[in-house]
Regions:
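N-terminal glycine/serine-rich phosphate-binding loop of ATP-dependent small-molecule kinases
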Residues: 1-104
Length: 106
């Protein structure tokens, strides 16, 4: 069988789903809240300002994909043929000349 992984980045969390590419059946899924979002960092609700840190995107990507795959039958990971990303909107990221997000610099 062949599988695909879908990742959905929302305002406060991200979700990963593993789907059978031939039937469309959902095999497993996982959700994780952005750690820095949950700590209230980079957000100012009084002025409707909500931001995410790039490391949160990486952290939840690693967690949700591994977690979803851990719930699948053995051999699923070796048969993933595609991965797709979805976001709630545009997420501009300021980078240095090498393309590294400024928030990731020491």
């Amino acid at each position: 069988m062949k599988y695909v992984i879908g990742l959905d980045y929302g305002s406060d969390s991200a979700r990963a789903v593993v789907v059978n590419a031939e039937t469309g059946a959902e095999i497993a899924s996982s959700v994780k809240y952005y750690p820095r979002w949950m700590e209230g960092k980079y957000c100012k609700p009084t002025i409707n300002q909500y931001r995410q840190h790039p490391q949160d995107y990486i952290d939840v990507l690693e967690y949700t994909v591994k977690d979803a795959l851990s719930k699948c039958p053995a051999g699923t990971a070796e048969n993933v043929v595609g991965i797709a990303f979805d976001t709630t909107g545009s997420t501009p990221v300021f980078t240095d000349k090498n393309g590294v997000p400024l928030a990731m610099l020491p």
